[in-house]
From Swiss-Prot:
<dbReference type="InterPro" id="IPR016039">
    <property type="entry name" value="Thiolase-like"/>
</dbReference>
<protein>
    <recommendedName>
        <fullName>Chalcone synthase B</fullName>
        <ecNumber>2.3.1.74</ecNumber>
    </recommendedName>
</protein>
<dbReference type="GO" id="GO:0016210">
    <property type="term" value="F:naringenin-chalcone synthase activity"/>
</dbReference>
<dbReference type="Pfam" id="PF00195">
    <property type="entry name" value="Chal_sti_synt_N"/>
</dbReference>
<dbReference type="InterPro" id="IPR011141">
    <property type="entry name" value="Polyketide_synthase_type-III"/>
</dbReference>
<comment type="pathway">
    <text>Secondary metabolite biosynthesis; flavonoid biosynthesis.</text>
</comment>
<dbReference type="InterPro" id="IPR012328">
    <property type="entry name" value="Chalcone/stilbene_synt_C"/>
</dbReference>
<comment type="similarity">
    <text>Belongs to the thiolase-like superfamily. Chalcone/stilbene synthases family.</text>
</comment>
<dbReference type="GO" id="GO:0009813">
    <property type="term" value="P:flavonoid biosynthetic process"/>
</dbReference>
<keyword id="KW-0808">Transferase</keyword>
<dbReference type="InterPro" id="IPR018088">
    <property type="entry name" value="Chalcone/stilbene_synthase_AS"/>
</dbReference>
<keyword id="KW-0012">Acyltransferase</keyword>
<dbReference type="GO" id="GO:0030639">
    <property type="term" value="P:polyketide biosynthetic process"/>
</dbReference>
<keyword id="KW-0284">Flavonoid biosynthesis</keyword>
<comment type="function">
    <text>The primary product of this enzyme is 4,2',4',6'-tetrahydroxychalcone (also termed naringenin-chalcone or chalcone) which can under specific conditions spontaneously isomerize into naringenin.</text>
</comment>
<dbReference type="Pfam" id="PF02797">
    <property type="entry name" value="Chal_sti_synt_C"/>
</dbReference>
<dbReference type="InterPro" id="IPR001099">
    <property type="entry name" value="Chalcone/stilbene_synt_N"/>
</dbReference>
Length: 396
């Protein structure tokens, strides 16, 4: 009996010490391309620019998909001028990887820089204090990578510790929070700059009569970048936390390898999403919640704030229904989906940014819609689910 008590006491003692040093998000910045498309008129543009106007039934099907998406607009680097200069991007099966790569290796770091500069400005500290840079994108692959290019664009120290993550998919935003937490808590005085930048040029192509997944991809994804500064030991009076990263977990849903897949081919990045994905995610989300929140005695999912990756409207609806969430719980996720589309890795950071800004505007008590505890959910190929427990901070 005494041995058991000692073990429990030690466990709680270690946990208490760990909580005292949890990583904090100190600043968030976001950026989007200047050009954007209206979802209601996009089917006309898409079938015209890809010389596919004769596919009338396919066009009407695409229009229905866009109308059901609950997306109002999306920002895109792709413009009519760019597509006319590179017509090989507009045909479904055209060899075009070189063209896509040439655009992405230039544009991804630039968009990342815009978001990073906003985060650094809000942080308010000298850029020389950044000790780590973690860059994530599903848009292209290059060496030296986007992390190297961003280091030069920002003028970071040549000794900054860099890590480049390519091809992680939609769960990468939550995974980056997990990685930033581990880095910040393992390096005293560390200041981690995290950047997620996504551009959909790799996935854009004309319609295919055989591949309906392609139409979903053309409707769903948008371009954007998000950045944040993370540290475990913020300086009082000099740095102001926005959220606290409490714990993190990742799990693979068994027997779902083929449910969500992206493959890099000569034609670019191909996309497949099974119709079962919304149901499978809804069936597995609660188990992740229970395991994550059990140590903290939380089991009412309406008592926490939600930063849920909006992979698509059907997924958001199914999870909301399965967990019995109130309509306001996933509002921030729905708002980001409506205004930007699915931003892949950048999505959850956009949601965090929107949430803390709206919480302040609405005169809430905390950055998390007035609540203390919250969860970040990301999911992607695998199916892989990342679960991050976060805490808000009081709004002064």
């Amino acid at each position: 009996m005494s041995t058991t008590v000692t073990v429990l006491t030690d466990t709680w003692s270690r946990r208490a010490k760990r909580l005292e040093g949890d990583a904090k998000i100190l600043a968030i910045g976001t950026a989007t391309p200047a050009s954007w498309v209206d979802q209601t008129t996009y089917p006309d543009f898409y079938f015209r620019i890809t010389n596919s106007q004769h596919l009338l039934e396919h066009k009407e099907k695409f229009r229905r998909i866009c109308n059901k998406s609950k997306i109002r607009k999306r920002h895109l680097v792709l413009t009519e001028e760019l597509l006319k200069k590179n017509p090989n991007l507009c045909t479904y099966n055209e060899t075009s990887l070189n063209t896509r790569q040439d655009i992405l290796v230039s544009e991804v770091p630039k968009l990342g820089k815009e978001a990073a500069m906003k985060a650094i400005k809000e942080w308010g500290r000298p850029i020389s204090e950044i000790t780590h840079l973690v860059f994530c994108t599903t848009s292209g692959v290059d060496m030296p990578g986007a992390d190297f290019q961003l280091t030069k664009l920002l003028g970071l120290n040549s000794s900054v510790k860099r890590l480049m993550m390519y091809q992680q998919g939609c769960n990468a935003g939550a995974a980056m929070l997990r990685l930033a937490k581990d880095l910040a808590e393992s390096n005293k005085g560390g200041r981690v700059l995290v950047v997620c930048a996504e551009i959909t040029i790799n996935i854009f192509r004309g319609p295919s009569l055989e591949q309906d997944d392609n139409l979903l991809a053309q409707c769903l994804f948008g371009d954007g970048a998000a950045a944040m500064i993370v540290a475990a030991d913020p300086r009082p009076g000099l740095e102001t936390p926005l959220f606290e990263l409490v714990s993190s977990a990742q799990t693979i849903v068994p027997n779902t390898d083929s449910h969500l897949k992206l493959h890099l081919r000569e034609m670019g990045l191909t996309f497949h999403c099974s119709k079962a994905v919304p149901s499978v995610l809804a069936e597995n989300v609660e188990d992740c919640l229970v395991k994550a929140f059990e140590p903290y005695g939380i089991s009412d999912w309406n008592s926490i704030f939600w930063v849920f990756h909006p992979g698509g409207n059907a997924i958001v609806d199914r999870v909301e229904e399965r967990l019995g969430l109130g309509p306001e719980k996933l509002r921030a996720s729905r708002d980001v989906l409506s205004e930007y589309g699915n931003l892949t890795s950048a999505c959850v950071l956009f949601i965090l940014d929107e949430m803390r800004k709206k919480s302040k505007k609405d005169e809430q008590m905390t950055t998390g819609e007035g609540l203390e505890w919250g969860v970040v959910f990301g999911f992607g190929p695998g199916l892989t689910i990342d679960t991050i427990i976060i805490r808000s901070v009081p709004i002064n």
